[in-house]
Amino acid sequence: MKTLYSPRRFYPVETLFNGTLALAGRDQETTGFAWWAGNARLINLSGKLLGAHVAHAGLIVFWAGAMNLFEVAHFVPEKPMYEQGLILLPHLATLGWGIGPGGEVIDTFPYFVSGVLHLISSAVLGFGGIYHSLLGPETLEESFPFFGYVWKDRNKMTTILGIHLILLGIGAFLLVLKALYFGGVYDTWAPGGGDVRKISNLTLSPSIIFGYLLKSPFGGEGWIVSVDDLEDIIGGHVWLGSICIFGGIWHILTKPFAWARRALVWSGEAYLSYSLAALSVFGFTACCFVWFNNTAYPSEFYGPTGPEASQAQAFTFLVRDQRLGANVGSAQGPTGLGKYLMRSPTGEVIFGGETMRFWDLRAPWLEPLRGPNGLDLSRLKKDIQPWQERRSAEYMTHAPLGSLNSVGGVATEINAVNYVSPRSWLSTSHFVLGFFLFVGHLWHAGRARAAAAGFEKGIDRDLEPVLFMTPLN
C-alpha cells in the first residue's frame, strides 16, 4: 500500500517538529503528516479512515438531534418560529409535521420524536466510529474486499461514486413519498394563508423542470431559485432522484472512458477536491434559495424575505390610508410618482415608493390582489381580507435585516422587532461555508495536480531561508 505515494512527491512539504509523538503506527515519520493534519495520516488505512468518517457522521447527527431537542425545549407556540431564532423546527414544519392551517403549530411531539431519533442514531454512529478507529482492522482490503479500495483503482472509485448517487436518489424520493403519501407537506400557497396538503398533480414535464436550469440567474428570472409551486419542487425531486439512481447504476456497471481517465486526476486528494467543489455549489445555491425563495422556505416559519417585508410595509400603509379616505389610485408622492401605486417599466401596476425595486415579488398574501396588469385597484378597494392585513403587518416588522448587535428590521420602521431572522442566519452561514469549501477545493486541487505531475508545491523545509537569518532580537 505504501508504494502508491512516493515519499519524493509527498513528504518534503511537511515539517517534522515533534518526532516523539507516535500514534499506533500513524506517526509523522511513517505517514509524512503530523497529528494536526487529521485524516491525511489515514490516506492508506481504509479501516481507520472509515472510522473517522463514521465518527464524523455521528457528530453531525448528534448536533442535529441535540439542537432539535434544544429548539423544542425553548419553543413558545404563541410566537412565530422566526422570532425565536429557530433553524431546525422550520425545516420540520415545512415537511408538514405538527402544522395546521396558516402555519400554526398544533403539535410539537413530532419534533421531539425527530430529536430523539437523531440522538439514538448518533449513538450508533458514534460507537461505529470508535470501533473502526480503535479496534477494527487498519485496512479493509484483505478481510472485506467489497469495502476495500485503492485510490488509483478507477473502476472501484466510480463504483463508490455510483453507490453514493443511489443513496442521494433514495433521499430525493423520501421527500416525494412524504409529499405524495405520508401526510403531505406545507404549502404556503394553499388558499386562505397556507396549509399542509398532499401533492397530487406532480410536474413531470422535462421542459418545465429543466427550464429552470436554463433560466438566467439574474433579476426576475432567478434560475432554479425562482421555483414557486410545490408541484414543480416535488416533480423536480422525482427527476433528480431518478437521474441519481440511474446514474449510480451506470457508474457501478461501467468503467471510466478513456477521456475521463486522461482528464481527471485519480488520487484521494483529487477526490477530496471534487467533493469540496460540489459542496461549495450546494452552499451557494442554498444561500440564494433561503434568502429569496418563500415556497421551499415558507415565510410563516422562516420569516419574510427582504423584498417581502418591504412590499408588506407598502401594503400595510396603503390599507391604513385607504381606510382614512386616501384615494390610493391617484395620490402623488414627494417625487411626483404615485405615493401608493405606480407602474413598472413594463406597465404593471405596482406598489409605489422605495419598494418599487421589489416589484417582482410574489407572495401568497399578495397574489390574490393581482389582476392581468399587476395590482388590481378594484380588488385593493374591496377584496383585502383580514388575514392578509395581519400577515403583512407582521412581516413589515420582521424584515431579515438584523445583525447581532443591531435592532432588527428596516431602519425606518419604528415598530421593527429586535431579532435576527433565520433567513439571515442560514443564508449568511451557507455563503461563508460555501466560500471556504471553494477555497479548500482550490487548495486540494492544486496539491493533487502537483502530486500527479510529479512535484509538490511548497518550500523545502530543510533549506528554508528563515533558518539562516539572524534572530530579530
Swiss-Prot record:
Sequence intervals crossing the membrane: 69-93, 134-155, 178-200, 255-275, 291-312, 447-471
Record-level GO BP terms: photosynthetic electron transport in photosystem II
Propeptide: 1-14
GO terms of molecular function: chlorophyll binding; electron transporter, transferring electrons within the cyclic electron transport pathway of photosynthesis activity; metal ion binding
Post-translational modification Phosphothreonine, affected residues: T15
Compartments reported by the entry: Plastid, Chloroplast thylakoid membrane
Residue numbers of N-acetylthreonine PTMs: T15
InterPro entries: PS_antenna-like (IPR000932), PS_II_antenna-like_sf (IPR036001), PSII_PsbC (IPR005869), PSII_PsbC_sf (IPR044900)
Cross-referenced Gene3D superfamilies: photosystem ii from thermosynechococcus elongatus (1.10.10.670)
Family indicated by similarity: Belongs to the PsbB/PsbC family. PsbC subfamily.
UniProt protein name: Photosystem II CP43 reaction center protein
Organism this protein belongs to: Ranunculus macranthus
